[in-house]
Amino acid sequence: MSIELKKVSKRFVDNVVLDGVDFFVAEKETVALLGPSGTGKSVLLKHIIGLIKPDSGEVWVDGQQVPLLGRKELAALRSRIGYVFQNGALFDSMDVFENIRLGISDEEKYADKEYCIQRVRECLRLVNLNEEVGRKFPSELSGGMRKRVGISRAIAGKPTYLLYDEPTSGLDPVNADVIDSLIERLQEEIGVTSVVVTHDVRGAFRVADRIALLSKAKIRAVGTAEEIIASRDPVVQQFLERDLEMAVIQANEVPTTERRIGGR
């Protein structure tokens, strides 16, 4: 039930994205993968789900080496993985109910209309949305609601693993806090093994058991929030300081009334 990358390297033409990366997530653990934009965090996620194969190294998920799996075995593995896309990746031509239903990977359950109705309702409840939202279309939703619907779809198939690709990207601090709270609560309620890719240090410290910092194609540091803060690595400290400055800027951009609501 674990995820492990061993000495994984990947390059695209002359661009080295991952260089001998070791990365481990224990069963029911949440690990946040931090790093600036464009450093290969999403590429690492795509290795886990088998969308990209490494140039060298090994990718293990659920006791299986992902790059060596055949089509059927890979499909079976993916059915146990929920993927939360950065932009939500909702189908605009489908209402919320049908978008979430797509996350039900079991063909028999997908064909059972009553099961789907009950499962979609449960998934909406888990992300703090009422069932009336199921009749809306993505164009009628706010950015924060679209993110929650994306998470709801990712958990619809009752996954063993959850992969979040920048779940709070593009959200103001208030809505980002809502998503972070949701990730925390889902971990408590459904107990999955999770990887949260983000550039938001504050959110990572909140939701993760451990944090890994990816910089210049390598894992620069791994540890608890306290261990990362205590690191004397200048790259780690520079990243933390830059994020703190950004947090102050964002806080000043949020209206006072919203900051009060978020702090309740």
Predicted region positions:
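Helix-to-loop junction immediately C-terminal to a conserved catalytic motif
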Residues: I49
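Conserved ABC ATPase "signature" region
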Residues: Q64-Q65, K113-E132
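ABC-type ATPase nucleotide-binding domains, specifically the catalytic core motifs of the NBD
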Residues: M94, R101-Y115, L126-V127
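Conserved ABC ATPase signature
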Residues: F137-L141, M145
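Conserved catalytic motifs of ABC-family nucleotide-binding domains
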Residues: K158
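Catalytic Walker B motif of ABC-type/P-loop ATPase nucleotide-binding domains
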Residues: L162-D165
